[in-house]
Amino acid sequence: MSRFFANGSDSESESSEEEVPTQFNNKAQNFQFSDDEEEVKRVVRSTKEKRYENLTSIIKTIRNHKKIKDIPNTLSSFEDLTRAYTKALPVISKEENGITPRFYIRCLAELEDFINEVWEDREGRKNLSKNNSKSLGTLRQKVRKYIKDFEDDLARFREAPDQESDVDEGEGDVHDSDADRAGDDSDTGFGVGAKMAELPKAAKSSVQPTKIIADDDDSEDSIDWDPDTESETESSEDENMYQNMRERFLKRTTEKEDKDDDKRKDKRKEQKHKVRKRADDDEDGEGWETVVKGNVVEKPKMFEKDAEIDVPLVLAKLIEIMSARGKKRTDRRLQIDLLFELRDISEQHSLGTAVAIKIHFSIISAIFDYNLKISEPMKLEHWALLLEVMQSMMKLLLANPDINMNESIAEEHEEYATAPFYVRGCPLAAVERLDDEFTKLLKECDPHSNDYVSRLKDEVNVVKTIELVVQYFELSGSNNERCRIYLRKIEHLYYKFDPEVLKRKRGEQQPATGAAGATPAAPVQSSVEVMDKLCKFIYAKDDTDRIRTRAILAHIYHHAMHDNWFQARDLVLMSHLQDNIDAADPSTRILYNRMMANLGLCAFRQENIKDAHHCLVDLMVTGKPKELLAQGLLPQRQHERSAEQEKIEKQRQMPFHMHINLELLECVYLVSAMLLEIPYIAAHEFDARRRMISKTFYQQLRSSERQSLVGPPESMREHVVAAAKAMRCGNWQACANFIVNKKMNTKVWDLFYESERVREMLVKFIKEESLRTYLFTYSNVYTSISIPSLSQMYELPLPKVHSIISKMIINEELMASLDDPSETVVMHRSEPSRLQALAMQFVDKVTNLVDVNEKVFDMKQGNFFQRGNMGNRDRGYNRNQNNQGGNWGGQRRDNRSQRNRNQRGHHKQNQQQNQQQQQQQVHTIDEE
């Protein structure tokens, strides 16, 4: 027995003796109660309930993540949701007849709205962390791809969305069975709580007094006693409540569920009451006003209640509002609202058009000032507002020619009372900034989304605004201002293709004129004519080189796009742009690269293969045409540039709708190189000093030849290389099939206007160059060749074959003569045979080897005394030594004579050695 029990009192021992049987009885009762299998309640859940419970729990998790904007966890939960729904599909198709549950559609709709809300909040999106931003993009793509299968269900749901009370009720219905099971399940930790909820109030009240009566000294005993009492009470209550076995398994409602039902009913009543009240208020004509959280800030009053509104008062108020521009605590949104209110007040009091124009220009400036960062695009609501105000101001200026608006007018010289009116401002600067903002909006959008198409539709309004400014400056404007606005119009016109120009050129369509019997209307100007007019004015009136250079480049681009090859080529040659373009700014150099690319495509369409190759070679040989054309940055070079440089280069990028197809450019370049390089290789097969026409094409060809096993071509480059190999053998049909086929048509040739004509031109050139290659390759085999057989072999007209062979003979490419009576080509055999060509190559290599050996021998033996200085280095050394002696002159003469004797001896030895080497080399050559 331990010390603790030994030192105890009698009362404690008595109490312990009394407590022992009680504890034993309780243990026995507890043991019998827990082991009683009749009391264990087992619940069998259907597969539908399990799957739906899994879906609803994940949906709740997603809602919690959305509330705190935890996007990475939202993404992972969404992936879990899709997997859970895939598992539940068999149950849905069986139980629900394939109809998607409404709570699942509601979750998808809420998730889509959440993503759109976060995505449209540009300022908030910039403040996201890197992980959140990356997860947002991934989540957006996955959700947009996933909900395509539920578009009809989502459309029906959005037509009649659930109210908040319906949402709660729907979720409650889904969990009804779960709540019942939670109350009955004794294996989980919720069994006791559910039973306590089912107990009547009398049972609870019988437990509570025992806790209150207990003394402080016996608190531990009371704590130990209470749970046993509760368990006994529960067991007795269960026995009394479930006298019938059937009642034990019937579904029953707890008091908690009854309270929840009452709450739902109260919510519905309140909502119906609110709807009725809102309808009554609408009938009374009283509108609703949204209460903003926080302190209500009253909008400052414009004028005093009894103030007389006139021009000086409005202008003073305008100066007061605009004086807050650029200050730190200025509310820029409020500033715009105040200016609009001031405009309405001036219109109500008819203060004149000049004041209205001044206020319009101030609104435009305030909208531009709203965005503090110049590199970022403005909000869409401000963009639409800017377009509207800008067009309204220009219409007022055009309707009132007595109003002069110029930035050179000082504020003290402004006139608003009497005509002519003078207003300080520069509409040209405003429209230039408007155009720049439009470009930034396009660059910000995803080029493959509907947002880009929507923004691109605004170009119509931008061009209309520019046209209004052009009309205004044509009436009153300097030459410099007209050149600037003309350049803006040119930059929106030069890259657009007008098919009517080509139809007129071919005579398929006559210029539009008036109807018969009516006065003849002025013919509609084509885009080429408009470009000619604008560019010629700039050529004559511009004082700055930049505007003129950009106008020339745009003019050449437009000519090349409409197949005016000779006009475009003459403009390039006469302007000498290629000599001065290195000194231009980066945007002008980008325009020059775009012009050269389009000029090469034009030359290719006009069958000038050599010119097309010359135009494209500078772009393609660098290996980075994407960067040179400002159509994107190469990822492998990003470590070579700083963040600031990368930001600047991104600002210079061209909008997506102005891009030139890079695969089309590369294909045209490689095909042009093939048509030039393959005949040249065949003509100079044994020339050791053969030059390369196209380095890029030559590398592609060599890399393909190094491969041991070459499969069928898949990419565009592989098609061109396979065609080159076929042409090298003179097989024009295989070459044409590799260049012109279904895959290549889809990738490349269908991108051309009148693509069928381009394909016919390609096949014709392939036939001609294959014929030339065949004659170069096999001329040493034939004694004579029949021209009709060549014509039949290459499916070319007889005069065309005759012309090709005649050109080859005239240019001394083919050593042959034409026999007209027999229509044959007689070979002269002046070219060396293959064995002779190899022997000549061998002789050249041996000669080079001999030269190298002689140089190496001279370096080893030395030829110092054969130089012209004749040992002047030693002369200075001897002079220094002799200065120390007395007989300086005698020693000098003796040294000189000795040196001459030594030189003569060395010279004779070198001559003898050289003669012996030459004799040995002659013997070795004879032996070989």
From Swiss-Prot:
- Comp. bias (Acidic residues): 11-20, 162-171, 215-240
* Residue intervals of the PCI domain: 656-832
Q: Which InterPro entries match?
A: EIF3C, EIF3C_N_dom, PCI_dom, WH_DNA-bd_sf
Which residues lie in Basic and acidic residues bias regions?
Answer: 172-184, 245-264
- Source organism superkingdom: Eukaryota
Per the record, residues carrying Phosphoserine are: S34, S165, S177, S186
Q: Which UniProt keywords apply?
A: Cytoplasm, Initiation factor, Phosphoprotein, Protein biosynthesis
Q: Where is the signal peptide?
A: none
- Name of the protein described by the UniProt record: Eukaryotic translation initiation factor 3 subunit C
Per the UniProt record, the source organism is Drosophila grimshawi
